[in-house]
């Protein structure tokens, strides 16, 4: 049993067979990790080992940007791993936007996950999650989603034909770009009266009662796949870690998986330097920011303060606070991976910040002008970087990697409202959320249907 599941609570620490299916630890209710007996596995002596697979095209799994790192997530045989070509993403040096963030040239990099098959980072995790589903013989799978998870699950089920997908979404809480993907790929779509947090609660209940294989990031195998985003970042930087990884924070699956990646790489002696981690909430969905920076909730060696969390949620419910942000992918008030994220922040000496809708949209416009258009949630990473540089937390010459989680076609309304000239549309999409200026907008220009007028304009 070289791969198994382990409860993250050190006071429990119970282990479970690889082929058992649990949403959380049956004994104490804590989250589960996928763990390995590394001393019994053929671990590479150096990360340079993976360079041998850069040009591999004949073996689909080695072409995958997830499974070519199979030795670092070896819970399934390579030939059993599910892939639809995910992980062909790039780390782009971003001198064009570094001044906006307050960084010197050569310091800022953008990890663009919008090149994945469904257009977001979720495909990294879905490749691993559906692989475990295949191992346990799942035929029906489900998720709750703000949009990207549903699109990813739907495309994997549609392409592989292994499982039927059911997705739960909140009423009016999903961008049409993402919803269209799930519908087009054939997923059964259940729209409930509520938001993502409500949908997440209902999908867990339905999964238990109907034996649906749950593929939210509560599933520890999802997070195994998302570790590979960090492997590709290191690969692009010639295996030298950056000073900072900055990532948007929603359900906290990415930040949790990044932390696990660095914990394991360090334990295996494959890296010495551990990057610092910054997780960026939207101000309208800032549970992690409030708990970490204000309430001072910490990992504390795995002995996190349950009472602080429960008290926070009780007060949130009493006040009727609901997540609300244009960055729909991170519009979440009850992040299921909260405790794993605390572990990542602890190991990576991390910080948490919140950014406003205005800061997100301005950052998004600055990313877009360089050709790497992103959805609003992605831009939270750049907005957070700008804030941390202004605070002096990030040095102007430190090497920073911002994770762009999804492409701009995921939520075109925000883009059109920001850059367009329709004041009524702007107000309905952005103005009501506190966005007042469009300093970096690329407004379309209206001109008469006359070639001379067009020529004069272009001159």
Enumerate the predicted regions with their spans.
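Positively charged, low-complexity intrinsically disordered leader regions
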Residues: 62-137
